[in-house]
Amino acid sequence: MARESGRKLIASNKKARHDYHIEDTYEAGIVLTGTEVKSLRAGRASLVDGFALIKDGEVWLQNVHIPEYAEGSWTNHEPRRPRKLLLHKREILRLLGKTRETGLTLVPLSLYFRDGKAKVELALARGKRAYDKRQALAERHAQREIARALGRRVKGHRM
C-alpha cells in the first residue's frame, strides 16, 4: 500500500490566532507512542491549552490533549503527557533566545500528518491585550462591511 502524500490536518488552534500576535512559525516533528498515532489518525486531538517549553536544550509540548485510543488496552497513553518536539539545534537555540525576551511564548497552531509523519506547527507569539482583541474584531467587522458594500455595488444594487 502506498504512503499518503500531502498534508492531513488533525487539529487547529483557532483561539491562538485570536489571543496572540503571531511573529514567526516553525514546523516540528513530534515523538508519539503507537496508541497516540492511532488516536490522531482517528482525528482526535485538542491544542486549545497547549504551549511549548524549552528544557535542557529540548523542546517539549505541554498540555496538548490526545485522547486514549478506544481499542487500546493496558498499553494506552496518558492523554495530557508532555511530548518531545523534534527541531534542528540552531532552531532550538534561536527559539531559546527569542523566548527569553519578555512576553514571547511558543504556541501550537496546528497538528497534522505530512507524508505519514505527525507534525506540529509552532508559533513564536506575543500575547494580545483585551483592547488589541477588540481592535482586531472591529477591523474584521469593517472589512466585512466594505466587502458587502462593494458586492452590492458590483451586482448593481443601490444602497
From Swiss-Prot:
Pfam families: SmpB (PF01668). It comes from Acidothermus cellulolyticus (strain ATCC 43068 / DSM 8971 / 11B). Its main location: cytoplasm. Required for rescue of stalled ribosomes mediated by trans-translation. Binds to transfer-messenger RNA (tmRNA), required for stable association of tmRNA with ribosomes. tmRNA and SmpB together mimic tRNA shape, replacing the anticodon stem-loop with SmpB. tmRNA is encoded by the ssrA gene; the 2 termini fold to resemble tRNA(Ala) and it encodes a 'tag peptide', a short internal open reading frame. During trans-translation Ala-aminoacylated tmRNA acts like a tRNA, entering the A-site of stalled ribosomes, displacing the stalled mRNA. Keywords: Cytoplasm, RNA-binding. It is found in: Cytoplasm. One of its GO terms (molecular function) is RNA binding. This is SsrA-binding protein. Belongs to the SmpB family. One of its GO terms (cellular component) is cytosol. One of its GO terms (biological process) is trans-translation.
